[in-house]
Amino acid sequence: MTDYLHSPLHAEHEKLGATFTPFGPWEMPLKYDNELEEHRAVRNAAGLFDLSHMGEIWVNGPDAAEFLSYCFISNLTTLKEGKAKYSMICAEDGGIIDDLITYRLEETKFLVVPNAGNADTVWDALNERAEGFDVDLKNESRDVAMIAVQGPKALEILVPLVEDTKQQAVMDLPYYAAMTGKVARKYAFICRTGYTGEDGFELIVYNSDAPELWEELLKAGEEYGIKPCGLAARDSLRLEAGMPLYGNELTRDITPVEAGMSRAFAKKEQDFVGAEVLRQRAEEGPQAVITGLVSSQRRAARAGSEVYVGENKVGTVTSGQPSPTLGHPVALALIDTAAGLEPGAAVEVDIRGKRYPFEVSALPFYKRDK
């Protein structure tokens, strides 16, 4: 029997009747009741997510910005205090180790948030690359919890719980920015980020404070129709928003060039791990790119389904399912650039031995009203 890691909110999930699923070394909520209702709650009102399985790594010191710029494909020296940046950490051969978000709290203080399944790998990579840099690394992945409130009502739910002197600052906080403050009397790192395609916030708090904050957010959101949401809804939401998932769209066999992230290092002058390979790959152009597919049929493509134009295989589906918001199947696929497919182009997807018509689509599939 596998001994899974549990979130500090595990007892809260049990009280809410959650169905659990393994996620890397963790056991996390898959859903609470109906994943479609959870999905729709986020699109129409708000959803509450436990993201405590995500990693949290602090990077402090005079060389912190230069160090992270060496480790990641993006230039972190230009990131302003209080802002966040989406980036990737790669191996020497350009393969993606993880995609992650980095926050700059102060001139020499950064927080790196890697994906749950890659947190230990990222921690090891940062330590291996730290030689020669004046930095201090601290892994708090097991010491803190992350709770996300996402959806069009997220701001209305969160603000009344924020300490009076910080409420206006939270209301004015731009997307991909962060600040500190008390939420429900608990010290929190408040980030206006998310993985759903909606407005929302991700709150990092000490493990001991997480259960009370979770309960306070549920209580505050009750009048708005907030629902606790599991990983199933999180996956369908991010797919509609065209956001990649590590292990599906992003792997060690994919480089940021195929993932559409060449712009992150296009003007970067500093050296970074994988730079030589990635700059050459970017100059040559990707052999395949992550592409959106849609269908008017009911049958959804799944990861591993092959994509065809006539008798020629042109790609493989990396993620796919029916879209609860749009009412038809959507998918992401790694498509050969040689096929020359533009939005609107017709393809076929082999689903259990039978081919179904799909169409190439621009991304994202869903975009919220601002």
Curated annotation (Swiss-Prot):
One of its GO terms (biological process) is glycine decarboxylation via glycine cleavage system. GO terms for cellular component: cytosol; glycine cleavage complex. InterPro entries: GCS_T, GCS_T_bac, GCST_C, GCV_T_N, GcvT/YgfZ/DmdA, GcvT/YgfZ_C, TrmE/GcvT_dom1. The keyword Transferase applies. SUPFAM superfamilies: Aminomethyltransferase beta-barrel domain, Folate-binding domain. Keywords: Aminotransferase, Transferase. Its EC number is 2.1.2.10. One of its GO terms (molecular function) is transaminase activity. It is an enzyme of class 2 (transferase). Pfam families: GCV_T, GCV_T_C. It catalyses: N(6)-[(R)-S(8)-aminomethyldihydrolipoyl]-L-lysyl-[protein] + (6S)-5,6,7,8-tetrahydrofolate = N(6)-[(R)-dihydrolipoyl]-L-lysyl-[protein] + (6R)-5,10-methylene-5,6,7,8-tetrahydrofolate + NH4(+). Belongs to the GcvT family. The glycine cleavage system is composed of four proteins: P, T, L and H. The glycine cleavage system catalyzes the degradation of glycine. This is Aminomethyltransferase. It comes from Corynebacterium aurimucosum (strain ATCC 700975 / DSM 44827 / CIP 107346 / CN-1). The gene is gcvT.
